[in-house]
Amino acid sequence: MSARLYLTNKYHMRLSEIEPGQKRNIGPAITGYDTQKFEQLWEKAIVPNCSESIAACKNGGKFMYRGFSSMQPVVRGRSWDDREPVDSDYKLSIRFDKMLKALGFKAIRSNSIFVTSSLKTAKYFGTSYIIFPINGFNYTYTPYKDLALSPESEDDWMTSNDPQVFYQEFHPKNKDLAVAINEGVEIYINGQYYALKYNVYGEYLSKKLGIGLPE
């Protein structure tokens, strides 16, 4: 989907108005759970514009989650352009991204949000939201569920300039999103997305899409 697509639904603004790293409150007011308003938003905006990620979640049998600080029930946001590492070494994060770029990956650590199908992991970072990336997003994942880059590990990729050495260590992929969701690995999402508060809409979405929730 083009980033300049104009949306006419009353809950929307132009997608191009969302700046990198920005989140905009959208949809029903936090003062009350308005089922009718949310169903309008879901059917008219989220379903058609997030069909790729919805299908991946259904095929993977799980939702994608992200934890962040917010009290709003529905948020639309966009990934970062220059995300700062939280738990990883800064220089290694730059090297990691450099290697991903050399291998042709578009979603890297510094320009993405991190999502996971592990609700427990998402809760560690803040309020839990179910994430539906908007069509046209890029993604990358590795076999790791919670990757923190530390110089203490002294792996070969840290000193080698050969992208294949990096590849053999991390085996990054940008296909079969449903597999990544099912396996519960950390996924980098580059693009725009809807975030729906888990404790408000989790049960509704579970019944709507036939996707189970964590026990």
Residue ranges and their predicted role:
Residues 21-43, 69, 77, 133-215:
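Active-site and NAD+-binding cores of ADP-ribose-processing enzymes
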Residues 1, 57-60, 124, 180-182:
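A generic structural signal for short, non-catalytic loop/turn and secondary-structure boundary residues
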Residues 12-108, 196, 206, 212-215:
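ADP-ribose/NAD+-binding catalytic cleft of ART/PARP-like enzymes
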Residues 3, 8-9, 15-20, 145:
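Glycine-biased, low-complexity coil/linker segments
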Residues 61-62, 97, 101-163:
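ADP-ribosyltransferase catalytic core
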Residues 4, 10-11, 65-66, 118, ...:
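Aromatic-enriched hydrophobic runs in primary sequence
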